Amino acid sequence: MASTTFALDVAEKALLEHGFFALDDSLVGDRIWEMEERGFPYFTEYGLDFCRQFAFDQRIRSILENSFEKCSLGHWLRYEEFPGHVECFRRGGPRAGRRVLVVHLWAKGSQVAYYVGSHLHEMATSRSRRSLYEIPLSELDRVGSKPKHKDFPDGGIVILDARLGFEIKEGYAITFLYATDEVIANWAKIVLPYSKALVEKVSDMEKESTRIGLNFAFEVSPGGKAT
């Protein structure tokens, strides 16, 4: 218990000061490779098992519950390399506050640069081609934010403040976003095809934590209205 508490203290300090924290995990690279080999079947029984394993990882859950009174998983996509472009999921610096946290699950061989402390500054941004916010290097220079380069030959996990700037130089990250209730209320739901098996999977996932919800909905039938 003491080591877990210490690790949580270290993670919280890193998130506050640097904007990100890397978790050691020797399994994630192989699990992502399996996911890729299957064609990234997110909304299947296999996909939800993958989601449950990592989205509710005990270490991630501890950080989320330490950061938020309540939050929900509201975004689950894969982001590929985009060298030469620094992006963030949320802008606004201190004015926006920490209301969204991101988990990057890095595939083997991925390389990324995280811009240390950039979450603490309000900067001019523009919309990137994949609907994130792009931060000009001139703005990062203005606030004195320098890149911390991370290589993941075997894959890896990083949890970060959604306001933090990052550049995916090589590879890709399967990405989870968790947001507070007031933020998630404005997000579209993740719509899953209806099946009894998937409903049961989601129900089991919802039992993992009373403080981390799922912004999921099911189609009534193929092409039907989500509920």
What positions do the PLM features span?
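Contiguous surface segments at macromolecular interaction interfaces
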Residues: 214-227
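Non-heme Fe(II) oxygenase catalytic core, chiefly the N-lobe of the double-stranded beta-helix
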Residues: 4-19, 24-156, 162-193
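Eukaryotic N-terminal low-complexity, Ser/Thr- and Lys/Arg-rich leader segments
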Residues: 1-6, 224-227
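Double-stranded beta-helix
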Residues: 178-215
